[in-house]
Amino acid sequence: MSLLGKYAGTHTADSAEMIAARERVFGEGLFEPLSGAIGAAVSDPRLEGVKGAVVDLGAGPGLYLERALEAAPERIGIAIDNSKFAARRAARCHPRAGAVVADIWDEIPLRSGSAAVILNAFAPRNGEETQRVLAPGGHLVVVTPGPEHLKELIEPLSMISVDVDKEERLHEALGPLANSLETSTLEWNLKLRRTEVADLVLMGPSAGRLDASEFESALERLSYPLSVTASVIVSTAVKTSTSESNHS
């Protein structure tokens, strides 16, 4: 289902090639530590008694939503992304999942209080709408790249570097939800083949700004297997009565 408006920013949507690269990366298990952390966050005992779906905002192909639903067998999942290629794949990520093509910068097409968990991994954040859709006692799980993330690739492959103000901007975007933010950092080492390095670059925001021939030449100059740092920050916020009253 597509709910994109006439003037929606589809130019920012992931391409079919980006989605395919992401699926190959996950198929190799390169982000398994993060997938495990998301599963643990969704099965947090504090969520017992909180009714609602697992909603993945900026879901991509639904690979994190799939792990979340495996960890929460009593819940359904909803993937929302502005890429039709991502949504098609996300709709098939799990038998209890559905997908909607929509721009999460606009009004999220869900009832107020209908989400027990909202996932937001490497995606834009709409704090006001997240606050509205999240049920009382529900959890928001945000994943952002850490300062060391893929540091060995940024300069040689002309990748976009991590924003040094990302944490500050996260707090600003979340509004009252930021008051309950709990943060942890996950780091692990990857030993990568040439094809895996290429896919890590091509699945992300750097893909659209690379010259194909220069990228191939840069890949050739690296030595494999290449040791690369993966570093992500997992932040969890709980919607409390205080955050609700602050929002109103």
Name the predicted role of every residue range.
Residues 127-141:
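A short glycine-rich, Lys/Arg-flanked "PGG" loop and its adjoining helix->strand segment in the class I
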Residues 11-37:
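Class I SAM-dependent methyltransferase Rossmann-like catalytic core
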Residues 105-117:
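A short acidic, Gly/Pro-enriched loop at the edge of an enzyme's catalytic core
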Residues 61-73:
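Conserved SAM-binding loop of SAM-dependent methyltransferases across substrates and taxa
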Residues 81-84:
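Conserved SAM/SAH-binding beta-strand->alpha-helix loop
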Residues 49-60, 139-169:
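Conserved class I S-adenosyl-L-methionine
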Residues 184-248:
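Conserved Class I S-adenosyl-L-methionine
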